[in-house]
C-alpha cells in the first residue's frame, strides 16, 4: 500500500513539474513578440523599396524610401559583411 502511495506521489510531482515548465515556456514566448518582429523586419527589409535609396557615403544617403502597409522606412548607410552602402531599413513603428 505504501509503495502505491509513493508511486502516486512521484507521478503527481512529475506532472506538477511538467505543467509548470510548460506554463513557463508559454510565458517566455509571450514576453518578446514585438522585439522579435522588429528584429525580423530590420534584418529582412522585405517591405522596403530598395531602388529609391541611393547615395555615395555615410552621410550622403537619400531619404526616399517607401514601405508597404503600416511600416516606415528610412534610408541609411549599412555596413555589412557582404556589401556596404545605402539601404532602406524598415521599422515597425
Curated annotation (Swiss-Prot):
Disulfide bonds: none annotated. Expressed by the venom duct. Its main location: secreted. Residues 21-46 form a propeptide. Contains 5 disulfide bonds. Residues 1-20 form the signal peptide. Keywords: Acetylcholine receptor inhibiting toxin, Disulfide bond, Gamma-carboxyglutamic acid, Ion channel impairing toxin, Neurotoxin, Postsynaptic neurotoxin, Secreted, Signal, Toxin. Belongs to the conotoxin S superfamily. Alpha-conotoxins act on postsynaptic membranes, they bind to the nicotinic acetylcholine receptors (nAChR) and thus inhibit them. This toxin provokes a nearly complete and slowly reversible inhibition of both the human adult (alpha-1-beta-1-epsilon-delta (CHRNA1-CHRNB1-CHRND-CHRNE)) and human fetal (alpha-1-beta-1-gamma-delta (CHRNA1-CHRNB1-CHRNG-CHRND)) neuromuscular nAChRs. This is Alpha-conotoxin RVIIIA. It comes from Conus radiatus (Rayed cone).
Amino acid at each position: 500500500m505504501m509503495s502505491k502511495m509513493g508511486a502516486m506521489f512521484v507521478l503527481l510531482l512529475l506532472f506538477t513539474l511538467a505543467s509548470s515548465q510548460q506554463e513557463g515556456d508559454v510565458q517566455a514566448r509571450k514576453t518578446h513578440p514585438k522585439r522579435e518582429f522588429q528584429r525580423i523586419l530590420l534584418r529582412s527589409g522585405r517591405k522596403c523599396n530598395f531602388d529609391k535609396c541611393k547615395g555615395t557615403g555615410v552621410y550622403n544617403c537619400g531619404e526616399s524610401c517607401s514601405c508597404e502597409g503600416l511600416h516606415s522606412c528610412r534610408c541609411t548607410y549599412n555596413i555589412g559583411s557582404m556589401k556596404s552602402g545605402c539601404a532602406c531599413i524598415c521599422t515597425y513603428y
